[in-house]
């Protein structure tokens, strides 16, 4: 995964969750790349944010985030079922901006 792709995935997650919670992330096309987003978070060292996203995935029916948007929308719980995870995300247990900057500054990226 390129550094640019890592940046894009993390920013999309952050934008969607900050705008409407994990429900919005999964409902919209950003959720198409859920597995890749978890990987991107881990690559920049945002393990706590990756854990929050994985726990959000576990709350979808069957604990899986289908890659296809409309299939994913059918397995979404009510927004309130994800609210506690939204609040954990909003507390920013990992400083995504700093971690992204550090990741981009690495010579191999």
What are these regions (language model features)?
Residues 1-34, 40-109:
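Extended, alpha-helix-rich binding/interface surfaces that flank or overlap catalytic cores
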